[in-house]
């Protein structure tokens, strides 16, 4: 049975099966909390955990951050740490509020679309799959069992842009 749709690539939204009636239109997608982005669509059944999918999307976005602006570089790192804690059923009080605060800061102060859209997958997943998040946070269990076991998540933001540091070292 269809559970979720993830649209627009890693920065896109995670939508519920109820969203199947939405047209692939910029305005309708934005109203639903998603974007068309790259045009990619991931379809997930009942065996897919929305928290785990969100963790994978956030990990990709964090890894792809260029590191030039503070809100995205540190914001994505913190969002990944929190999302991983939730996926491991080890969340701390205030984690969701902290995610909202970090996401809001990124949306208003990141220098490019990557940082400004980086909170989108989390926001839409929280909106459409709050039951999955509640199971991880309150019941300390993954409803699908999909978050159990070790996972490889790259945790390196690209090296900070040293080419833009003023001084003689750039002449080398």
Across the structure, where does each feature detected by a protein language model lie?
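Redox cofactor-anchoring modules in respiratory/redox and cofactor-processing assemblies
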Residues: 1-171
């Amino acid at each position: 049975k269809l559970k979720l749709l993830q649209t627009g690539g890693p920065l896109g939204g995670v939508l519920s099966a109820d969203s199947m009636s939405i047209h692939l239109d910029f305005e309708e997608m934005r109203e639903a909390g998603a974007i068309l982005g790259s045009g990619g669509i991931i379809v997930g059944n009942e065996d897919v955990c929305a928290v785990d999918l969100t963790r994978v999307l956030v990990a990709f976005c964090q890894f792809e951050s260029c590191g030039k602006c503070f809100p995205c570089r540190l914001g994505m790192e913190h969002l990944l740490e929190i999302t991983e804690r939730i996926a491991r059923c080890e969340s701390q009080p205030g984690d969701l509020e902290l995610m909202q605060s970090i996401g809001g800061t990124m949306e208003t102060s990141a220098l490019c679309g990557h940082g400004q859209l980086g909170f989108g997958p989390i926001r839409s997943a929280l909106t459409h799959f709050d039951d999955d998040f509640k199971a991880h946070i309150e019941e300390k269990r993954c409803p699908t069992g999909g978050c159990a076991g070790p996972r490889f998540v790259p945790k390196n933001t690209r090296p900070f842009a040293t080419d833009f540091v003023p001084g003689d070292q750039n002449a080398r």
